[in-house]
């Protein structure tokens, strides 16, 4: 896409490299606050913009026995607290179209998980919120195919679209091909 996307005071563009980081899944308010504060301290020291990322539901876990997260209501309350107490933008995954509007009331960025990056209804629902959307490239897609995911969101008049290189599957391994970034721009 090769353009600038603003998320609060964080700018994504050709001259900046913001960090999206945090625990994969929300464990507790205390843990989330501690992680956000620690990462913020480090990124401020090196002058790197930072968005806190954590998920209220990891719906794509391999095992049914794995911890999925606190649920949407509790997770959004925790993300809201992180956002206000630490003073940073927050990002979280959405898995279903009917989650997008509620999540956009708290999250500064809606993230589409890699395995859901071609789900038209989800992409359109996320785009319709007007909130910036980060689409993780599916391991099964070439970077050229990501333009179709971005175009689905763009049909909603939301131009605040970010694409994240997630890697490519080679057998059972996952390899990140950094040349994909320039193609997806």
Question: What is each residue range found by the language model?
Answer:
Residues 38-46, 65-91, 126-132, 182-185:
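Alpha-helix-loop-beta-strand connector modules within alpha/beta enzyme cores
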Residues 1-19, 77:
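N-terminal amphipathic alpha-helix/helix-capping segment at the start of soluble metabolic enzymes
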Residues 70-71, 85-99, 108-121, 132-143, ...:
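Catalytic beta/alpha-barrel core
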Residues 130, 134-185:
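Catalytic alpha/beta core domains of metabolic enzymes, predominantly
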Residues 23-32, 50-72:
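Glycine-rich, proline-tolerant flexible connector loops at the mouths of alpha/beta enzymes
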Residues 14-17, 46-50, 84-90, 106-108, ...:
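Short, well-ordered coil/turn segments that N-cap beta-strands
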Residues 33-40, 76-80, 100, 123, ...:
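Generic structural signal for well-ordered alpha-helices
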Residues 22, 52, 103, 135, ...:
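Conserved, mostly hydrophobic/aromatic
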């Amino acid at each position: 896409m090769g353009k600038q996307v603003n998320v609060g005071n964080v700018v994504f563009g050709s001259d900046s490299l913001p960090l999206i980081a945090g625990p994969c899944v929300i464990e507790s308010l205390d843990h989330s606050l501690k992680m956000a504060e620690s990462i913020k301290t480090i990124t401020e020291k090196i002058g790197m913009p930072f968005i806190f990322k954590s998920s209220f539901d990891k719906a794509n876990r391999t095992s049914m026995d794995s911890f999925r997260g606190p649920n949407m209501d509790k997770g959004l309350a925790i993300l809201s607290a992180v956002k206000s107490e630490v003073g940073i933008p927050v990002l979280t995954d959405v898995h279903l179209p009917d989650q997008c509007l509620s999540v956009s009331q708290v999250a500064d960025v809606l993230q589409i998980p890699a395995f859901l990056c071609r789900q038209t209804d989800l992409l359109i629902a996320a785009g319709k919120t007007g909130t910036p959307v980060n689409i993780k490239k599916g391991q099964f897609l070439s970077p050229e195919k990501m333009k179709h995911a971005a175009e689905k969101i763009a049909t909603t008049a939301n131009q605040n679209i970010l694409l994240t290189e997630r890697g490519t599957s080679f057998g059972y391994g996952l390899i990140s091909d950094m040349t994909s970034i320039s193609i997806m721009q």
